[in-house]
Amino acid sequence: MPVFGKEFAFLTHYERNLRGGSQPILAQASDGLLYVVKFNNNLQGANLPFNESIGSELYRACGLSCPSWKPLLVTEAFLDKNRDCWMQTPVGRLRPSSGLCFGSRFLGGDGIRLLEILPGTSFKRVRNYQSFWLAWLIDICAWHVDNRQAIFQEDANGGFDAFFIDHGHLFGGPNGELRRNFQASRYLDPRIYQSVSSQQLQSFQKIARCLDVDQLWQQIQTLPDDWKTASALDGFGQCLDRLSTSNLLQNIVDMMVEALRQANEREESKQRSERKLSFSVLCPGIQGAGLEHNFVENRAGYPACA
């Protein structure tokens, strides 16, 4: 039976290992496409396949951009042939389990430029920057216990589209038992959260409240049985309850706005202090000569691999 209406493909060619605690790999499947593959017996936890797949579907249901995903069949023959894809542990190599695993479509290749980190000056070129507000709202309701991850795809005109990735720490994490402060799930650089109107914030709450919950539950039934752990299902159910509670959503939005206001104040204060410090270390002779010190942002983007 198709999973979420998706026919599975099987892995055919191992490309390379990727960064990340789950030790994902990049591999080609029988449909000719490249995928970021996360094995079921990954070192992070048993809930990872559920969290990744349902997290992607939840985000898509809210109108947020995510790479498409597909169940991928890992065969024993593939594992025998590609021992480099085996996971590393303190006591040696761990053979991945065979069977259906989660695969997220790789968005790079064919001259497409992907960035994992943008310099702050480039955030204004992100077309869907407002999506980060909605993503944070969803993540708080879903008990996301890690910073929100995103990659940025650049177009020919220098603009960026953000795609949200790595949902494995939703619903209390890969084992379902973690809880964090609501700011833990924020995108790491607060400058991406540019100003939004109160009407836009209200529209985000409406999107969350109007989810087709019954359809999501029906689709979950198509997942492989070993993906549907009790703690993952419970975490997802609690997430939907929070998303449907209007007063709670309003309280969360208020906390988000206040947290971002404080974060921006701290960032501005830090930048002012750095500017004062940098000019104070220049010797009078250099300053008198009219020479200036160039400060270059070091957080330039670099190609993404997961």
Place the predicted regions along the sequence by residue.
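Conserved kinase catalytic-core segment
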Residues: 110, 115-177
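A short, terminal or domain-edge coil/loop segment
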Residues: 18-22, 92, 120-134, 200-205
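C-terminal catalytic region of ATP-dependent kinase domains
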Residues: 40, 159-306
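Conserved ATP-binding subdomain of kinase catalytic cores across diverse folds
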Residues: 2-114, 141-145, 179
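Short, surface-exposed linear patches
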Residues: 48-50, 57-61, 90, 123-129, ...
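A general structural signal for short secondary-structure boundary/capping elements
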Residues: 71-74, 147-152, 208-215
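Short C-terminal domain-edge/linker segments immediately following a structured domain
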Residues: 57-58, 66-70, 132-139, 192-202, ...
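Residue-level signature of transmembrane alpha-helix interfaces in integral membrane proteins
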Residues: 79, 155, 182-184
